[in-house]
Design a protein with these regions (language model features):
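Ligand-binding beta-strand-loop-alpha-helix segment within the catalytic cores
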Residues: 35-88, 95, 101-104
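N-terminal phosphate/diphosphate-binding loop that engages ATP/GTP or pyrophosphate donors
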Residues: 2-60
Length: 222
């Protein structure tokens, strides 16, 4: 946005419905290609959220003017409403990119942690489109020094195996980075030519970096 480009946000999983002020436009469209054609025809937006629709397993979607928010998203502090929205299959996103408006960047949420500080992916995760040219791995350093257990850790059994710890053991900086840099952890299913970024949130602390794993590292201190 700061460079004058447009941004489209979507997901391959489920997200909380962004509140009205989070984006210039929000489109609910089962067909992503049709949604992009609509965006091409409009000039009244710089940021847009595009989702397939409401999650039928969740409560009925509320109106966008609703003012009852959940806590803001823990990573980007985006205000959200208490309704889950469905995204698109990774292949559908890659197919639809041919219809993307010009001078437009995409942000695609491809995995979720159910509000936990750290997670490891299950067999079907993460759902990263093969066509993306960059992937950002996100983890919260506040899990360091805490027991390896729910609710701080999502899929703790898998995290424990990758970290080399037992369930309930204290998460160390070394174990934290083992999960993030493991081929079945933070590096799972990354497209081979994609730029690899690491975003560390939470309280500042020293973590051992492994050279050559990520192309860039950014910290956001809470």
């Amino acid at each position: 946005l700061a460079r004058g480009q447009r941004v489209i946000f979507t997901t391959t999983t489920k997200i909380w419905q962004p509140a009205q002020q989070a984006f210039d436009l929000m489109l609910l469209a089962p067909d992503l290609t049709q949604a992009l054609l609509q965006l091409q025809a409009r000039t009244d937006w710089r940021s847009a959220c595009v989702v397939a629709g409401a999650d039928p397993a969740a409560a009925e979607i509320g109106v966008l003017a609703e003012t009852r928010f959940l806590e803001r998203d823990s990573v980007n502090h985006m205000p959200v409403l208490p309704h889950k929205m469905l995204g698109y299959a990774p292949d559908a996103i890659c197919t639809a990119l041919a219809y993307s408006p010009s001078h437009c960047q995409w942000v695609i949420e491809a995995d979720g942690a159910r509000g936990a500080l750290l997670k490891a992916p299950d067999a079907h995760e993460p759902m990263i489109p093969a066509c993306v040219d960059g992937v950002v791995v996100v983890a919260n350093r506040d899990v360091i020094g805490q027991p390896l257990a729910r609710p701080r850790v999502h899929r703790p059994e898998i995290v424990a195996r990758l970290a080399g710890l037992a369930l309930g053991e204290v998460m160390t900086p070394q174990a934290f980075m083992r999960v993030i840099t493991h081929p079945q952890g933070g590096l799972k299913s990354l497209p081979p030519n994609a730029v690899r970024g690491l975003l560390l949130t939470g309280s500042p602390c020293d973590v051992p970096m492994v050279a050559g794993v990520f192309d860039w590292v950014m910290t956001v201190d809470d």
